[in-house]
Amino acid sequence: MERSKGKVSVFLARLAWAVWILYAAAWSWALLTPQPVRLRDALLDETPALVSSKVVHVAGYLAFTMLSGCLRPAVPYRWLILAFLSLHAFGTEYLQQFVPQRTPSLHDVGLDHVGIVLGLAITWKWWLGTSASAA
């Protein structure tokens, strides 16, 4: 029984990492291509478009942080993941200056970090608890 339990937990850990990597790739793509902006502008007027894009920044990083909490790595690596999320926010905003119809904004980086903080607040037990490998 213990042996099969270990196999299940290894499978779930690998699945969590696979989902995290897919989300990271999809979120990066969404932030670094003009298609989401074109779709937003085709569907919404100026004010709702602006509000929706800001909500998406917060929600995207909130989800990214929650997914990161699901990984439950050893404690020192948790802080590396949070550093990665922060650098991802800065990096994608910086790179947006090279993408047509995208504009970099420190305000958006701030909103990204609001999403990170909200994600931490929601999943704080995952971030402060024992790692999955130690449990």
Model features per residue range: what roles?
Residues 2-107, 113-135:
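Bulky hydrophobic segments
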